[in-house]
């Protein structure tokens, strides 16, 4: 490879990445997932488009694994451990039992549609059996889904790769050696994958956390150190025959949920690196496929994709979530629909090619086709389906910007900036009348281009920029303080006619509204009663019906219900609505 060739690679690579970024702006306008657009850019530059010939499967495997490691590290850093209280066990059930059922049902259909033996069909099922972290993290962000649904899908996508990889590798070995039956020893291999991945991921995350917090470096080096550490965890786990994907996700989870030096710098850098990883990975996968090879298998492949989307995935979710009573039918239906496939199936489809199996090209083309259908059908319809199934909750007001204040190595102080519109409650009020959350301070106030020194008598005006020092847990209270005035719109329609305190005595609430109170524990609070009715860990948006009245969890205070919205039957309880 000479200098001219290297320079050409730089030029073509930069043009493709730049084109992907520019064209991605069409994503929100057309309602098409950005990952599909990036795939399309890669395909259009490939054999049937721009003429770039790329058939180096080992390189694609390398790029795919590297990209997924970065994406999962970033996903782990942004996943809150608090979400585990509502979704850990359901997600693990989907990541194991769910993948097995999807693999089996999809494999049997593939064997029938493409005239393959059962083991070959099951290999196809295993390749496309897991949801994809890159697709899930990319498409779920900012959709306003409730915590139970979001956490279940994100944890599932971050933890179901070990099962899919295990099944794929096992079935490839069986086909290569001519085996036709399964052995119980395979179960120990699966447990080893999860066990080694879990131990090294958690241990490596803890070691990286100690290292980052104890060593003094230039600010820009901390994100690079975290990425390097994550890749060490990923590679070491793979070398010990564990699940590198699970390990790097858990490594990010440990670092992201503890006080860590330069948190915002790490998150900002990882955000850019995760986007670059997604773009590079889907460009390479788009270049790898030959579009005209997909045409002969289009109809049976479409049938297989629809079978998986409409039957295999819903049945696997139904069985996987059967023990968990907190999941409503609407939530199960949405989780069934968002079985997003992405880069992982395509990367797994490279395994048979590298092993030299018969029909390996068919497996790859099928995986690519199913991913394309999944992203186009499920990814494009995701916002519409979320609204149809009512799994969204009103968004919490957020500051227009936030930045870390590195007061101490593990300092979690942040600076939040709010812009006050005409509809804000606090306009016209002096600062002394604001009931600021405990532990927060107004640091500065900007009016136009002028920096004001805030005092108790300073009156807030429209378009003021207010800078507040506080912690992340202060955001809900600050959001309510500087939020828009309540409208008889989404918030009131969602939470009900009134919002009551969760620690109100249930018997007193029943007496106040004339509801039957027979058999009620006089000491039970409203929040505890609603939590019992939910049947699991409650979340904002959970709804139950009692005495022909709808009760909705409006605010969570840690693991307790803080506020409950109540909606009476139409016309039976007139009066102004309240939203706190």
From Swiss-Prot:
Residues 402-484 form the RCK C-terminal domain. SUPFAM superfamilies: FAD-binding/transporter-associated domain-like, TrkA C-terminal domain-like. SMART domains: CorC_HlyC. It is found in: Cell inner membrane. It comes from Pseudomonas fluorescens (strain Pf0-1). The gene is nhaP2. K(+)/H(+) antiporter that extrudes potassium in exchange for external protons and maintains the internal concentration of potassium under toxic levels. NCBIfam families: PRK05326.1-1, PRK05326.1-2, PRK05326.1-3. Keywords: Antiport, Cell inner membrane, Cell membrane, Ion transport, Membrane, Potassium, Potassium transport, Transmembrane, Transmembrane helix, Transport. InterPro entries: Cation/H_exchanger_TM (IPR006153), FAD-bd_PCMH-like_sf (IPR036318), FAD-bd_PCMH_sub2 (IPR016169), Na+/solute_symporter_sf (IPR038770), NhaP2 (IPR023729), RCK_C (IPR006037), RCK_C_sf (IPR036721), Transptr-assoc_dom (IPR005170). Pfam families: CorC_HlyC, Na_H_Exchanger, TrkA_C. One of its GO terms (biological process) is cell volume homeostasis. This is K(+)/H(+) antiporter NhaP2. PROSITE patterns: RCK_C. GO terms for molecular function: flavin adenine dinucleotide binding; potassium:proton antiporter activity. It catalyses: K(+)(in) + H(+)(out) = K(+)(out) + H(+)(in). GO terms for cellular component: plasma membrane. The chain crosses the membrane at residues 6-26, 34-54, 57-77, 94-114, 121-141, 162-182, 193-213, 217-237, 240-260, 269-289, 292-312, 334-354, 366-386.
């Amino acid at each position: 490879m000479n200098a001219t060739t290297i320079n050409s690679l730089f030029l073509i690579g930069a043009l493709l990445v730049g084109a992907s970024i520019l064209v991605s702006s069409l994503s929100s306008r057309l309602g098409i997932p950005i990952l599909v657009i990036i795939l399309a850019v890669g395909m259009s530059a490939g054999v049937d488009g721009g003429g770039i010939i790329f058939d180096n499967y080992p390189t694609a495997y390398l790029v795919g694994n590297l990209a997924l490691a970065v994406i999962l590290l970033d996903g782990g850093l942004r996943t809150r451990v608090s979400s585990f209280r509502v979704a850990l066990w359901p997600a693990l059930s989907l990541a194991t039992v769910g993948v097995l059922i999807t693999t089996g049902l999809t494999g049997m259909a593939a064997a029938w549609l493409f005239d393959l033996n059962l083991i070959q069909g099951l290999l196809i099922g295993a390749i496309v059996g897991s949801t994809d972290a890159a697709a899930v993290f990319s498409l779920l962000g900012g959709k306003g889904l409730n915590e139970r649904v979001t956490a279940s899908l994100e944890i599932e996508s971050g933890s179901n790769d070990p099962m899919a990889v295990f099944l794929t590798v096992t079935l490839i070995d069986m086909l290569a050696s001519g085996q036709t039956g399964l052995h119980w020893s395979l179960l120990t291999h699966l447990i080893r994958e999860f066990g080694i991945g879990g131990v090294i991921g958690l241990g490596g995350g803890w070691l990286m956390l100690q290292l980052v917090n104890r060593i003094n470096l230039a600010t820009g080096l901390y994100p690079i150190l975290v990425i390097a550490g994550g890749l060490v965890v990923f590679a070491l786990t793979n070398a010990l025959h564990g699940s590198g994907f699970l390990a790097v996700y858990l490594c990010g989870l440990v670092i992201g949920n503890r006080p860590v030096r330069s948190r915002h710098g790490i998150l900002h850098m990882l955000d850019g690196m995760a986007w670059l990883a997604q773009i590079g990975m889907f460009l390479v996968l788009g270049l790898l496929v030959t579009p005209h090879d997909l045409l002969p298998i289009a109809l049976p492949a479409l049938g297989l994709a629809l079978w998986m989307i409409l039957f295999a995935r819903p049945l696997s979710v139904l069985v996987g979530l059967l023990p968990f009573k907190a999941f409503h039918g609407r939530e199960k239906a949405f989780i069934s629909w968002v079985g997003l496939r992405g880069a992982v199936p395509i990367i797994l489809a490279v395994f048979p090619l590298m092993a030299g199996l018969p029909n390996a090209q068919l497996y790859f083309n099928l995986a690519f086709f199913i991913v394309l259908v999944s992203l186009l059908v499920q990814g494009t319809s995701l916002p519409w389906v979320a609204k149809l199934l009512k799994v969204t909750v009103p968004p919490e007001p957020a500051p227009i910007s936030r930045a870390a204040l590195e007061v101490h190595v593990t300092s979690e102080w942040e600076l939040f900036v709010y812009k006050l519109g005409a509809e804000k409650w606090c306009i016209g009020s002096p600062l002394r009348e604001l009931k600021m959350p405990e532990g927060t301070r107004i640091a500065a106030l900007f009016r136009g281009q002028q920096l004001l020194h805030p005092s108790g008598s300073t009156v807030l005006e429209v378009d003021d920029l207010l800078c507040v020092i506080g912690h992340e847990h202060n955001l809900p209270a600050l959001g309510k303080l500087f939020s828009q005035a309540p409208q008889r719109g989404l918030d009131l329609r969602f939470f009900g006619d009134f919002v009551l305190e969760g620690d109100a005595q249930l018997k007193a609430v029943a007496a106040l509204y004339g509801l039957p109170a027979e058999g009620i524990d006089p000491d039970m609070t409203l929040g505890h009663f609603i939590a019992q009715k939910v049947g699991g860990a409650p979340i904002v948006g959970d709804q139950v019906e009692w005495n022909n009245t709808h009760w909705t969890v409006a605010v969570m205070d840690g693991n307790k219900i803080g506020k409950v919205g109540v909606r009476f039957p139409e016309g039976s309880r007139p009066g102004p609505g309240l939203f706190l």
